[in-house]
A protein has these predicted regions:
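Active-site-proximal beta-strand/loop segments in catalytic clefts of secreted hydrolases
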Residues: 97-101, 192, 223-225, 259-260
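A conserved cap/lid and substrate-binding interface adjacent to the catalytic center
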Residues: 59-186, 209-213, 217, 243, ...
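Gly/Ala-rich beta-loop-alpha elbow adjacent to hydrolase catalytic centers
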Residues: 190-194, 198
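Intrinsic structural disorder/low-complexity segments
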Residues: 16, 25, 144, 148-151, ...
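Short, glycine/acidic-rich beta->alpha junctions
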Residues: 69, 197, 229
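Serine hydrolase/lipase
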Residues: 1-12, 156-187, 203-375
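N-terminal low-complexity, Ser/Thr- and acidic-residue-enriched intrinsically disordered segments
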Residues: 1-102
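Short, solvent-exposed loop/turn and secondary-structure capping segments
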Residues: 106-114, 200, 231-233, 267-268
Length: 375
C-alpha cells in the first residue's frame, strides 16, 4: 500500500475488511477459517503495516440457518503497537470491527431481523450493567426517562459480546482478560449494520465494565448507521463517548458518519422536524417522476409503520455530515432510485474518506471456487 492513511482512514479500512464474507455461503467453520486466512494480508495491504488480528474472526448464524445462507454477523479485533492519532499522540490500539449485512438481498436474517426488526424494544440497562452481560429481556413498552433500543439491535449486540469464535473465548472475556499497555486505545467501528451495532456494543461493554482497562481511551467510529434507540440511549452514548474531532468531516470520533444523500441514517426517526428522519428519503435526489415517487412513498410508509409499532420515538445519535456526489439529474424510476441509494450508502463514503485508496473486496469468488472443488 503506497498511500499513507490517517488513523480514521485506517479504522475505516478495518471496518471494510470485516465485510469480506459478503454474500459468501458456507458453514460457520468454513467461513471463519477462510476469513481468518485472508485477514492478515488484508489488514497489511489496506490498513497498513503493523496491523494484525488479535481476536477472531467470529462468524454467527441464526438457529435454522443452512450452509447455503450467508453469515448473519462477522466481527474481529485488530491491534497495532503504535498508531498516530489526530492530536499527535502515538498509542497501542485495538479495533473491534463489525461487518455490515452480508446477505445480498432483503430476505436474509441480518436484513429482515437485525436491520429492520425495530417494532419491539427493550430497556437497555436490564441486560448490560454492573459487571455482567446477560441475554436481553423480552420486549416491553418503553418507559419515559429510560434508555431503550430495538430488541433486534440488542439481541445482535449481545451475540457480538457473548458468542465465541470456534476455539476461542467471547469478545467480552477477551477484553476482560487483556492487559493493555498504559494509554492503549480501544475503538469500535462498523458500516451500515455495523454502524448500528458498534455504538450499541460499545455502550453495553462499557456500562458492564468490560472496557474498564481502556477507561478514558475508548472511542467509537460508526459509519452510516441507522438509529439504534431513543433519545435517552443517545444521551447515554454521548455521556460515555463525548464527540471529539473536526466537525462535518470524517475525522471525528464518537459520532455517526453520515452522508446526507444516504437513506440508511434517516432510519428510524419519524419526527419531520429532525435533520435525519424517514420523511426525507423520497426527496434526497430531487423531484422524482410520479411512479417512482409513489413507490418511494409506499416504502417510507412501511418503514414508518415498523418504527411506530415500537411505541417509541427513535432518535439519531450525534452525527458528522459529509456529502456524496449528487446525481446529475433525478432518478427516472424506482430501479434508478435504488441504484443511487446503493451508491450513496457505500461507494460515496469510500470516495470521501479514502479518496483513491483501494479497498478490500469480497471473498465470494474464492468461496465459490473452494466449494466447487469439494463437490
Amino acid at each position: 500500500m503506497s498511500l499513507k492513511l490517517d488513523v480514521f482512514q485506517q479504522v475505516y479500512q478495518l471496518s471494510l475488511a470485516s465485510n469480506m464474507a459478503q454474500a459468501c455461503q458456507a458453514s460457520p467453520l468454513e467461513l471463519q477459517t477462510m476469513i481468518a486466512a485472508a485477514l492478515p494480508e488484508t489488514l497489511t495491504k489496506y490498513a497498513g503495516p503493523g496491523w494484525e488480528v488479535a481476536w477472531g474472526p467470529a462468524v454467527w448464524k441464526h438457529d435454522g440457518a443452512t450452509d447455503e445462507m450467508p453469515p448473519d454477523n462477522v466481527w474481529y479485533v485488530a491491534k497495532h503497537p503504535a498508531i498516530e492519532f489526530e492530536d499527535g499522540s502515538i498509542c497501542p490500539t485495538y479495533v473491534v470491527a463489525i461487518a455490515a449485512s452480508t446477505g445480498d438481498d432483503f430476505k436474509s436474517y441480518d436484513w429482515l431481523y437485525e436491520g429492520f426488526g425495530v417494532g419491539q424494544v427493550v430497556n437497555f440497562l436490564e441486560w448490560a450493567e454492573g459487571g455482567r452481560i446477560v441475554a436481553p429481556p423480552v420486549s416491553s413498552l418503553p418507559t419515559s426517562n429510560l434508555a431503550y433500543t430495538a430488541k433486534s439491535t440488542t439481541d445482535a449486540a449481545y451475540t457480538l459480546a457473548a458468542f465465541p469464535p470456534l476455539g476461542s473465548q467471547p469478545l467480552k472475556e477477551f477484553l476482560k482478560a487483556l492487559n493493555p499497555q498504559p494509554g492503549s486505545k480501544l475503538i469500535f467501528t462498523g458500516h451500515s449494520l455495523g454502524g448500528i451495532l458498534s455504538p450499541t456494543l460499545a455502550v453495553a461493554l462499557t456500562v458492564a465494565g468490560f472496557t474498564r482497562k481502556f477507561k478514558g481511551n475508548t472511542l467509537v467510529y460508526p459509519i452510516c448507521g441507522a438509529s439504534p434507540g431513543n433519545t435517552h440511549f443517545g444521551e447515554l452514548f454521548q455521556d460515555l463517548f463525548p464527540p471529539r474531532g473536526d466537525i462535518s468531516t470524517y475525522r471525528r470520533w464518537n459520532v455517526n458518519l453520515v452522508n446526507e444523500l444516504d437513506p440508511v441514517p434517516q432510519l428510524w426517526c419519524v419526527d419531520p422536524m429532525g435533520k435525519l428522519n424517514l420523511n426525507n428519503i423520497p426527496h434526497l435526489y430531487g423531484e422524482l417522476p410520479q411512479a417512482a415517487r409513489i413507490y418511494m412513498n409506499s416504502i417510507v410508509r412501511c418503514l414508518k409503520a415498523r418504527a411506530t409499532a415500537s411505541g417509541m420515538m427513535y432518535s439519531p445519535l450525534r452525527y458528522s455530515l459529509i456529502r456524496g456526489p449528487e446525481p446529475s439529474s433525478p432518478p427516472k424510476n424506482a430501479e434508478e432510485v435504488i441504484a443511487e441509494f446503493t451508491k450513496q450508502h457505500s461507494r460515496a463514503y469510500n470516495e470521501v474518506v479514502l479518496g483513491s485508496a483501494p479497498t478490500p473486496g469480497s471473498l465470494r469468488q474464492r468461496f465459490t471456487r473452494v466449494r466447487r472443488s469439494r463437490l
